[in-house]
């Protein structure tokens, strides 16, 4: 971020002295100046080689360094601000509160003054004559800013001196300080000139100062949430146009979530929401700082008599600049994404509730809209669109003023995806956070919207695979008696099934998605037995939730029977088969001994019951099965994805459905197959059919009870803190909760009692994650109260027991004495 610039172009960058960190300008020929040709590496070497022989008079003594202006303090005894150390101490406090706002600029040193120059416009912001610089000091490794240059300046018109602090990265503060001090010394008129030696010393410091890179940094490796979204725009657009509103399948996708999956997803969404709120708060503070600088600048200009700039006005002018438009657009996108998350989390968060946070967000939203001069810029932000649930939630929550602001932002803030034309491309939104944080991936089928977008976009890249799936779906539709049911095929493609192919443009992708009804589909009946056996190793424990799934333990070796969907059908070493999610499996080489296909002992599984009570394969063509239940006949049709699509219309003969999606799907298929068998085999009466169905249902219940499988949980040590905890305990606890280093360093110096004494506002002031810290502290306090309450109860019971024992003891002694007297 920091750098430095000199005055002449070169092949190494903007200026020739960029390699050695200073901008001293040796003598060049007039021809070089006129033609402005770029200096070659050899010429640059010769210039540096001859520099030592140049006379002092031939050196222009101008050097430039790229620095970050951190802050400026007025040295005043009333504010306990007297020395540079006082300024560094206050800088640390501001840094802990997140209130240091850096500004990139160029610090120029010549034989008359130290100047600050705007990096973009190259205008001079400040000019400190050397005789006004009272003190120059380098402060190294004293805080998170490890190379701070301190300048104490006082112009004749000032009553109190100013302390300016700069962070110097590429050229360290001690070198710049030596340059400035030598210039001050030479300006006082000594016989021995110090500055040429100082510049030579900086020049010789080349090995410790690496040159800036010639090329930009390479792009980081893509993650699931950040994978070349632009290159898949055309593919995703074609898919979106073909499928419509991509939000609909998500509603059904989450119905099979286990409590653990839901808790992980909610925790992830809460983390994203917290980071969004932090970034919005940071941006609002940045706007406020710019407004304060502008107000102070206006006040100074109003009170100023002459046209000459006063001390500090140049830096104020730079700080008064508003953020660039890209940052405004990013902030508006985070507002919209935040509203979507609040609608998702409205049933899961409290203190503050989702409605409270909506009201909280509309205040800064209004500020940002006003800062842009009206709603035009906000109205241009298309992605992300608000979900239908979000729009309903906002309609129910907002008050009159908030509704007026919301409506002024237009259709991009008020219409869900279904209300936009199918052919209009809505780019997927992947949030980028200021501190570089990325949301954690969820290792189960409840993938995030960003992951779904990537997987869906990637699926289009492999057209052949998509056509095969379309044919399978069409085949299933033709053979299914439940004509109203449509499998959820195509909404949650697994990224590891598809390989990256050449990207299609939008037109080609759209053509690829058109149904190919004239193709023959018998090739899909090719038996799976002809394929070589494949095996996978389980990465985690998995507990089956119904009879179609298979419970596995970590490191189990499983034979893959069908891997064409997101849930794979596998067989374990005992011969039991069922479905498991593919993201807990790793493909492995076949074991030498093989798993064997010996018939396992008889167990009441749903697969065997279907073979006994269902129709024979020869009697009935295959029918599609709702996810994740496998087909009841041994025809190798792939299982559907585990995201069930509810049946909107079912035949009248289906009267009962189990609450489990798998059992429900199974009953639909069984009923449909039974009714298709009736015209062929009428030997059974209606009463026998009812008895068979009753026996079937009861047997399924018994087999489900027998298939319960408990996986032992690993004992994870829990770290807690109390009022007696040491600062080291507090630091360990903060690290165990996953707080960032700024929070750990800011609060890790406190003991337990000090940490518990802070309220929410104080925590937010000290660290950016104050709200999360406060929530965790509240949990710890509640746990301490529970434990202390039980301890107090035990103490009361112990004392009461002692009293009873003492009373009984006294009574026994008295009786003995009485007996003796008698």
Swiss-Prot record:
Coiled coil: none annotated. Residues 64-194 form the PTB domain. Residues 1-10, 17-30 have a biased composition (Polar residues). GO terms for molecular function: actin binding; small GTPase binding. It is found in: Cytoplasm, Cell cortex; Cell projection, Ruffle membrane; Cell projection, Growth cone; Cell projection, Stereocilium. Ubiquitinated by the SCF(FBXW5) E3 ubiquitin-protein ligase complex during G2 phase, leading to its transient degradation and subsequent cell shape changes required to allow mitotic progression. Reappears at the midzone of dividing cells. Phosphorylation at Ser-625 and Thr-629 by MAPK following BDNF treatment promotes removal from actin and filopodia formation. Phosphorylated by several receptor tyrosine kinases. The modification Phosphoserine is found at residues 58, 476, 625, 659, 662, 685, 811, 815. It comes from the Eukaryota. Keywords: Actin-binding, Cell membrane, Cell projection, Cytoplasm, Deafness, Membrane, Non-syndromic deafness, Phosphoprotein, SH3 domain, Synapse, Synaptosome, Ubl conjugation. The keyword Nucleotide-binding does not apply. Residues 680-698 are annotated as: Amphipathic helix. Expressed in all tissues analyzed, including heart, brain, placenta, lung, liver, skeletal muscle, kidney and pancreas. Expressed in all epithelial and fibroblastic lines examined and in some, but not all, hematopoietic cells. Residues 1-39, 202-225, 298-320, 612-689, 787-822 are annotated as: Disordered. Residues 718-738 are annotated as: Helix bundle 1. Residues 766-785 are annotated as: Helix bundle 4. The modification Phosphothreonine is found at residues 223, 317, 629. One of its GO terms (biological process) is positive regulation of ruffle assembly. Residues 649-822 are annotated as: Effector region. Residues 531-590 form the SH3 domain. Residues 299-309 have a biased composition (Basic residues). It is linked to Deafness, autosomal recessive, 102: A form of non-syndromic deafness characterized by profound hearing loss affecting all frequencies. Vestibular function is unaffected. Defects in EPS8 are associated with some cancers, such as pancreatic, oral squamous cell carcinomas or pituitary cancers. Contributes to cell transformation in response to growth factor treatment and is overexpressed in a number of tumors, indicating that EPS8 levels must be tightly regulated. Homodimer. Part of a complex consisting of ABI1, EPS8 and SOS1. Interacts with MYO15A and WHRN. Interacts with LANCL1. Interacts with EGFR; mediates EPS8 phosphorylation. Interacts with BAIAP2. Interacts with SHB. Belongs to the EPS8 family. PANTHER family: EPIDERMAL GROWTH FACTOR RECEPTOR KINASE SUBSTRATE 8, EPIDERMAL GROWTH FACTOR RECEPTOR KINASE SUBSTRATE EPS8-RELATED PROTEIN. This is Epidermal growth factor receptor kinase substrate 8. The gene is EPS8.
